[in-house]
Every structure is written in C-alpha cells, then in structure tokens.
Amino acid sequence: MSTAVANRLVEIDEEARLAAVRRYDILDTPPDGSFDHVAKVAASLFDVPIAIISLVDHDRIWFKARYGLDVEQIGRDPGLCASAILQTDPYVLTDASCDPRSLANPLVAGEFGLRFYVAAPLRTGDGHNLGTLCVIDHKPRVVSEEQIAQLEALAAVVMDQMELRLAARRAVTELEQMVALKDAALERSSMLTREIDHRVMNSLQQVSALLSLQARGLGNSDAA
C-alpha cells in the first residue's frame, strides 16, 4: 500500500471518529458530577495528583472531567491523548522522560514535567476512540496489570454514562417528534371538523332557502 493511500485511509477513519464524537454531543457541556467522580476515583486508584476524562476534537483535547488540574482543554498537539486514541490497548508511560514515544513532547520536556501517564481509550461500540480516561504524575511510577484493568473498567463506566445520555436525548427527541405529529394531527382534525361544520351549515342554509322558496311558491298557488 502506498503512503498516499495509507494517509487517505487514516483521514477517512479520523473523519468517522470525529463524527462519532459529534454524535454524543458532549463537547463543551457543563461539568457533570458522575464524570467528576470517576476522575477522582481513578486518581485515588493510582495515587496520582491528576486524572482526566478527555475527548479528542479535530484541533484540541477537551476535558469533560479533570481532577487536580485547572485547565479545560489543550491543543491536540502536543497532547498525549491524541497518541493514546490510535490504539485499542491502554497507553502506558511509566517514565515519559525515557520513553522514545514521549521524551521530546513539550508536556514532558517542558515546565509541566509529565513523567507518568496511563490512558484507557473511551471506545464506542462501533469501534471509535473518542478520547481517554488518563492518570498523570510528575514522577515515574510502576503500574500493575490489575491497576490497568481497573482503569479500563472505569473507562467503560464513562462510556456507559455517555451511552445513557445519548439514549435519553434520542428518547426526548422522539417524544418531541411524536408530540409535534400529534399536535399536527389534532390541528388537521380540528380544521377538518370546522370545514365539515361550515359545509353542513351552508347546506342547511341552502335547504332552508329552498324550503322557503317552496313554501312561498305553494302560498302563491293557493292564492291563485
């Protein structure tokens, strides 16, 4: 496969992934206690100062929930989450300053001083990674397989919450559409009733007029 074809396939997949992000309609929504709680639990599980639930947009990484961090978003480059969503398995950096994948990253080499980073992808049922649940520390750490499995379980909880919210929004939309259809049907029924009443009234008036004419005709005949 040529490089151009491979790059185009990546672009198509990214377009589909971004469409999935939009489908959940969660970017730039207010803080949510259930997501905040998951981030706090993740930080406690790893005994680290920072945990983030992130969504990777086309040019930024937006934080739906964050523990131990004040910023709401960062640029997609150099964010590590943008790299983490490229794989289905958790992305693990026990010492980012020594890992060739990250040692030149500004978040590692710069003032922030990131050293430890573990991210579990937020993966949809149709196979798109929307973002990550990640934990961060400023010093190297050892991580166990059990901790990684627990982080994946928490990421699944995040996706369950997102799916529930999506289903609720769809249910509300369907209900609103049904109400609109019902109102439209009632309006049509009301208009039809008014039209029938109008036609019946006109017919009655015509019959009454004919009867009056007939009565006058009979009266004139009697007089003759």
Annotated model-derived regions:
Residues 1, 28-61, 77, 213-224:
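Helix-loop-beta substructure at the N-terminus of cytosolic sensory domains
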Residues 115-124:
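A short, aliphatic-rich beta-strand micro-motif
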